[in-house]
Design a protein with these regions (language model features):
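Generic short beta-strand segments
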Residues: 92-95
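Short, well-ordered, aromatic-rich surface patches in folded extracellular/luminal domains
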Residues: 5, 18-49, 70, 74, ...
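Bacterial N-terminal signal peptides that target proteins for export
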Residues: 1-8
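C-terminal motif of bacterial Sec signal peptides marking the signal peptidase cleavage site
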Residues: 13-16
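Long, charged/polar, surface-exposed segments that mediate recognition or autoinhibition
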Residues: 76, 81-90
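Generic detection of short hydrophobic beta-strand segments and adjacent strand-loop junctions
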Residues: 57, 76-80, 126
Length: 157
């Protein structure tokens, strides 16, 4: 009797240690460029990493910029140049996002979220981490947004 009980307990224990299998999802479809409407807001979040970073940036279609670094408690505001705004619009229009197929096991990676809301009420959201960023097609936009964020935090501090 004790062997049967031990076998059952070990089976339950091992089953609890197994990774969860994500629910099946439809094959990810590539998202063509985000239509840039007359008025839009883009929110970019970079979180995670070894340092536990949490940075958020919001840019509006008129070029207003707000960056918050939760770890340092720093918030800066600014204005994009016409060239920076044009580059951002080009990258949004050329975005070809391919949603990663499942969770990754990268504990110390940065996680990136891009959310673009337009005045039509539609919102586009894309997520990736360091291991899926390049394959997702989000890399050019995320890299540019990360550069804008880092520059804003450097220049106003």
């Amino acid at each position: 009797m004790s062997r049967l009980l031990l076998t059952i307990l070990m089976t339950v224990f091992l089953a609890a240690c197994m990774p969860l299998t994500p629910a099946p999802v439809e094959a990810p479809l590539a998202t063509p460029g985000v239509p840039v409407q007359a008025n839009w807001t883009i929110r970019f979040t970079q979180s995670g990493g070894i340092m536990g970073m949490m940075r958020e940036m919001e840019i509006t279609s008129d070029g207003n910029l707000k960056v918050t670094d939760d770890r340092t408690g720093k918030t800066v505001t600014g204005q994009l140049t016409a060239g920076e705004l044009a580059q951002l619009s080009t990258l949004m229009g050329g975005l070809a996002y391919d949603r990663p197929s499942g969770p990754t096991s990268c504990a110390d990676c940065f996680n990136y979220t891009v959310e673009i809301a337009s005045d039509t009420g539609k919102t586009f959201t894309a997520q990736a981490d360091d291991t899926t960023l390049e394959a997702s097609g989000l890399s050019p936009l995320a890299d540019y947004l990360r550069t804008l964020m880092e520059n804003a935090l450097k220049t106003q501090g």
